[in-house]
């Protein structure tokens, strides 16, 4: 039996979620991924403990194996409040943005769209750990700010992936 039990985060009124393994799932050895059927959906934003317990053909129960602190997250991160806005005239590379959650990885991309030719465009700057924290980041000079072409017109975008792999 595989059981997901809420241990924190968002409320899950259907917890615990249990499913019986069957067929090839019951064979000895490693099973890196397998679908769990006949189980109600988990709740986004909930933290679960995962319990595995088996019974052999003689009816002997195994000791339960428990994995704690599994965050179930299916919501893509939201990136908002990006500044400077399109068509702004600036003489710096400071930006403002807001992240809905901590990002596992992220980047800011300056893509030239007009003006003086910039053969190095697009400029992709990976966000450092402190720049990926959830919340507002105001008038920030990135640790690895790009060297943009004077007279270039750029579109700025921010991309990110959260710890669950949501983009």
Protein language model regions, located:
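Solvent-exposed loop/turn segments flanking beta-strands in beta-repeat/beta-sandwich domains
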Residues: 1-17, 98-121
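Signal that preferentially marks extracellular ectodomain short beta-strand elements
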Residues: 22-47, 57, 129-153, 163-164
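Conserved structural position at the C-terminal beta-strand
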Residues: 52-54, 158-160
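Low-complexity "stalk/linker" and mucin-like segments enriched in Ser/Thr/Pro/Ala/Gly
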Residues: 9-26, 87, 115-135
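Structural beta-strand segments of beta-rich domains
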Residues: 91-95
